[in-house]
Amino acid sequence: MAQSQNIRIRLKAFDYRVLDTSTQEIVNTAKRTGASVRGPIPLPNKIEKFTVLRGPHVDKKSRDQFEIRTHKRLLDIVDPTPQTVDALMKLDLAAGVDVEIKLQS
């Protein structure tokens, strides 16, 4: 029995709206070229919190808190055609979206 190939795409962004539009572009491109898509699967958000002193001196109890949320999505493209790979290579995604692509057998 022949092994099927999968393309696993992992997307990260600080803004979930930009991430969702980029994910939708990838899904539409893959479906248009004849590949089946599993996902998008939302992965857990990473929340980094930073606490800093508000003033330069004296008030230790006066502090500000900041956080950075990193949103993640996972896509699996099952049995991609050569047209799918070409279309994904030419796809221009929004700035601020980090893309990791792995080819699995």
Swiss-Prot record:
The gene is rpsJ. This is Small ribosomal subunit protein uS10. GO terms for biological process: translation. Pfam families: Ribosomal_S10. InterPro entries: Ribosomal_uS10, Ribosomal_uS10_dom, Ribosomal_uS10_dom_sf. Belongs to the universal ribosomal protein uS10 family. SUPFAM superfamilies: Ribosomal protein S10. Involved in the binding of tRNA to the ribosomes. The keyword Ribosomal protein applies.
